A protein has these predicted regions:
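Well-ordered beta-strand scaffold positions
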Residues: 102, 109-111, 117
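Active-site-proximal loop/helix segment associated with metal-binding centers of metalloenzymes
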Residues: 114-161
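Core catalytic region of metal-dependent phosphoesterases/phosphodiesterases
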Residues: 2-7, 12-106
Length: 161
């Protein structure tokens, strides 16, 4: 039986290329032996839209696409940093987007998948912000801004977190 692999919170960004190199080696090596790869959020340090692909995002899409071409199913769940990853990038990378919570059958065991930020239930302010950024209307409004404006918003959010 081929393994099912899970990764999360890599926080990839152009400024830290070593992490992207590690992921590339993983995708071209051990991951090729898997039946599926689940990415459970925060693959990227930030994501400002599928229309603003960084060199890192392009490199990752190529690696994930190559993995999918070898028959490994790849799934993506949004995190608190990359909640704007959309269908366009998912298609480019050969990933299937998942809902916020999902129960899968992991070799006969029901297994709940989620990004850990949903468990910060005592942090009322964070949960309110989380609901806002996951709202499709809010996301559409943000995505209607220029790339420069979205980048500035992302930098401000990173500084505040």
């Amino acid at each position: 039986m081929k393994p099912t692999l899970f990764i999360s919170d890599l926080h990839l960004e152009d400024a830290v290329p070593g992490r992207t190199g590690w992921l590339a080696a993983f995708l071209a090596g051990p991951a090729t032996e898997a039946s599926a790869l689940y990415i459970l959020g925060d693959l990227f340090e930030f994501w400002i839209g599928d229309d603003a692909l960084s060199p890192t995002a392009q490199h990752v899409a190529k690696g994930l696409g190559a993995l999918g071409a070898q028959g490994v199913k790849t799934f993506f769940m949004h995190g608190n940093r990359d909640f704007l990853v959309g269908e366009k990038y998912a298609g480019l990378a050969g990933m299937e987007l998942l809902p916020e919570e999902l129960v899968i059958d992991l070799h006969g065991t029901p297994t709940l998948l989620l990004h850990g930020d949903s468990l910060c239930t005592d942090d009322v302010e964070y949960q309110a912000m989380r609901r806002q950024v996951r709202n499709p209307d809010w996301q559409a409004g943000v995505l209607s801004l220029s790339i420069e404006e979205r980048l500035q918003m992302a930098m401000q959010a990173r500084e505040a977190s």
